[in-house]
Curated annotation (Swiss-Prot):
UniProt name for this protein: DNA repair protein RecO
Function: Involved in DNA repair and RecF pathway recombination.
Keyword DNA repair carried by entry: yes
This protein's encoding gene: recO
Entry superkingdom: Bacteria
Pfam families in UniProt: RecO_C, RecO_N
């Protein structure tokens, strides 16, 4: 195996005395893991920050072997670690990606979407310009893994207008008229998840994160809830304070 590709750093963990195992999302090969010799050195630690864009080369003699990985920094987002809200968002989105995707499965549109959300975070660290996109990324990831929510029509009546809720069991949208008697048992559906042109305020973002969080915990992160969802809760708490 020899793959040279752009990649987004998603996770790093120490391995051995000085090395690191890095997981990175690539446009054509999906999530790949590799061993970086000296990955915890002063030179490489700033390169292997989650969210950074690198030129990566994976090399392995057999398909079963963990590849060796060398990286060259293409674009650094490490400076955003000084912005608590932006850092929390990058931590969560990269953790979600690393924890959810199987290695070696192509997810080209997820790569493009993650890169776009990270760029939006970089240019608007206050979250006004990227919070809705982060929720949409969560929905896209769920859909790519076979857990798409059906937000196109009311599951009860077939109506396509005034969709206001989502069933926490089926993941189907519910219209306001059909859902109001059961509102306490349903999840609010913010308009920006139905109509991409709709405006969103902080309460809408919180509702969107509550919606995706329910299904991520139930369907995607079942075996990793304690670790991966801690990063998400830090982001939700920070955004909740803005609402």
């Amino acid at each position: 195996m020899q793959v040279r590709t752009p990649a987004i750093i998603c996770a790093m963990r120490a391995h051995g005395e000085h090395g690191a195992i890095v997981r990175a999302l690539t446009p054509d090969h999906g999530l790949l893991a590799g061993y970086v010799r000296g990955g915890r050195s002063r030179r490489l630690r700033p390169v292997l920050v989650a969210g950074n864009l690198v030129e990566a080369e994976f090399r392995a003699r057999t398909a079963e072997q963990l590849p060796g990985l060398t990286v060259e920094l293409s674009h650094s987002r490490a400076g955003l670690l000084a912005e608590p809200l932006a850092a929390a968002a990058i931590d969560w989105l990269s953790s979600l990606t690393a924890a959810s995707l199987a290695e070696g499965q192509p997810h080209a549109r997820l790569y493009e979407a993650l890169d776009a959300v990270l760029a939006a975070i970089e240019y608007a660290p206050s979250a006004r310009g990227w919070a809705a996109a982060a929720v949409r990324y969560e929905l896209m990831l769920m859909a790519d893994l076979g857990y798409a929510l059906d937000l196109s029509a009311c599951a009860a009546t077939g109506a396509r207008d005034d969709l206001a809720y989502v069933s926490p069991k089926s993941g189907g949208a519910v219209s306001r008229a059909a859902g109001e008697p059961y509102a306490a048992r349903l999840l609010p559906l913010p308009a920006f998840l139905v109509d991409p042109s709709a405006d969103s305020d902080w309460s809408d973002i919180v509702d969107g994160m509550r919606l995706t969080g329910h299904f991520l915990a139930r369907d995607i992160l079942v075996d990793r809830r304690a670790d991966a969802l801690d990063a998400r809760q830090r982001l939700v708490d920070r955004i909740g304070r803005l609402a």
